Amino acid sequence: MHSYDYLLILAFLVLLLAPAPWLGRFFYRVMEGERTWLSPVLGPVERACYLISGVDPKTEQSWKQYAWALLAFNLAGFVVLFAMLMLQGLLPLNPQQLPGMEWSLAFNTAMSFVTNTNWQAYSGEASLSYLSQMVGLTVQNFVSAATGLAVLVALCRGISRRSSHSLGNFWADMTRATLYALLPISIVLAVFLVWQGVPQNFAHYIDALTLQGADQSLPMGPAASQISIKQLGTNGGGFFGVNSAHPFENPTAWSNLFELVSILLIPAALVFTFGHYVKDMRQSRAILGCMLALLLIGGAVSLWAEYQPNPALNIAGVEQTAPLEGKETRFGTTGTVLWSVATTAASNGSVNGMHDSLNPLAGMVALVNMMVGEVIFGGVGVGLNGMVLNVLIAVFLAGLMIGRTPEYLGKKLQAQEVRLLVATLLVMPVGVLVLGAIAASLPGPAGAISNPGPHGFSQLLYAYTSATANNGSAFGGFSANTVFHNLMLSLAIFIGRFGYILPVLALAGSLAMKKTAPQGQNSFPTHGLLFVTLLTVTILLVGGLTFLPTLALGPIAEHLSLGF
């Protein structure tokens, strides 16, 4: 590594952490309906949305009403997007005259984007019209992220409220999250990307002649507006097939840096939003410390692994400087590895290089980031939800060790809360191990693997881990566009999304009804170094031990077999 590489890592951390406290405070004020500097502009738009839809933002909902509203909204979005993808050949803004999607692929794509997963078994420039990209996928990029933010706010209210039977209003939370939290930042980033050279037009594809004399079609389209929210909303689905490795999607080192920062910016800010809700910023600092520790450990391991010389090339006597297979030279090894860690630490899934080409242990870091439940920053809203669940599990374990009824911020954790926590622990194993085992045991679906041996198993394991974790990235050698995998991965995506959201809302409703007991000297502190250590170990044990056998069969076996 050179000085530039260290400077890149430092710039990434500074740009990520410096604005996070301010944004966190802003998001808190926005979601609670307080007046902000954007209110004169967006306030009339917000009120118009309520008037047109007949929503009273002051009418609060119980956790069940909140959940039903969320499910109804997501179902409607799925149906509309599925129909749009199937019928895109008949719809306008399709200058390339692309036909409608095959039904299983359309089903998978709709499920993927509605749930903020953005798993893509297609190439955007060859499969989707501008209308499908702009009205179908980009809209879902906004509202799926807003859904996650709304669920987080509901959980924050459940923890902070006393003897309450309501969690807020889903429709108001969705509207505020979209208008105030996501839209303004996305516009700023989109303008920056256009300045850097990302297309934003409705032009036909351009036929060009290469230096070698071959014909080439250069894709166009409204890319910048979709790419900005794909990063900020931790969606990750690329406008073009190779995602942010494409020179039109990520043309410069500056666009690479700011797209990289935007992956984790809102999740980092929401940690401070949580502190404002519970009126204790020490909780935010503890959670952020745990997230940063896990991120930096994963980044260090991944960078070390990726800079190891290839044993096969050593035997051949080839001089090695940096492994560039599957990487864009304009980003280099460090820029690609840093992105792979950030995109899997969040439920983003965008890539600026091919994860399939990472060295085995670097690929394992990406897998582990997802297997722990996308809690290392995680997706917008849902990532912090997962981290708070791990906080409650750590508190429960601490209570068992000291022989006291576990409590968090004055709320006692009793049998009902523990049952809900256990239910969320089953989500990743069911989606990854059960569905993945079914796919691996059948000869037809297993044929999607392009590489025999441990790496082929890693390809399949990565696909089902990514789907269940609502990440969306993939080892590119896995041929996912079959009816079986389209439907099975859709099921994994559904389990991974709503298997977390519904128990979280039920938990929020249960906690909201509890009274808050004053914390005494015997209360277990949840803001010191001891608790941060306990929380980190809990995350690694719950995620690591569950999936250790599969990791041993995949990336660990590959690492050993290659002679690293």
Swiss-Prot record:
All disulfide bonds of the chain are: none
Looking at the UniProt record for this protein, which Gene Ontology cellular component terms does it annotate, in alphabetical order?
plasma membrane
The record's listing under Pfam families reads:
KdpA
Query: Which positions, given as ranges, span the membrane?
Result: 7-27, 67-87, 135-155, 179-199, 258-278, 286-306, 382-402, 420-440, 487-507, 528-548
Q: Keyword set for this entry?
A: Cell inner membrane, Cell membrane, Ion transport, Membrane, Potassium, Potassium transport, Transmembrane, Transmembrane helix, Transport
Subcellular location, record wording: Cell inner membrane
In the record, the note on similarity to other proteins reads: Belongs to the KdpA family.
Q: Which NCBIfam families match?
A: kdpA
PANTHER family, from UniProt? POTASSIUM-TRANSPORTING ATPASE A CHAIN, POTASSIUM-TRANSPORTING ATPASE POTASSIUM-BINDING SUBUNIT
UniProt function note: Part of the high-affinity ATP-driven potassium transport (or Kdp) system, which catalyzes the hydrolysis of ATP coupled with the electrogenic transport of potassium into the cytoplasm. This subunit binds the periplasmic potassium ions and delivers the ions to the membrane domain of KdpB through an intramembrane tunnel.
Relate the assembly described in the record: The system is composed of three essential subunits: KdpA, KdpB and KdpC.
> Protein name, please?
Potassium-transporting ATPase potassium-binding subunit
Q: Which organism is it from?
A: Pseudomonas syringae pv. tomato (strain ATCC BAA-871 / DC3000)
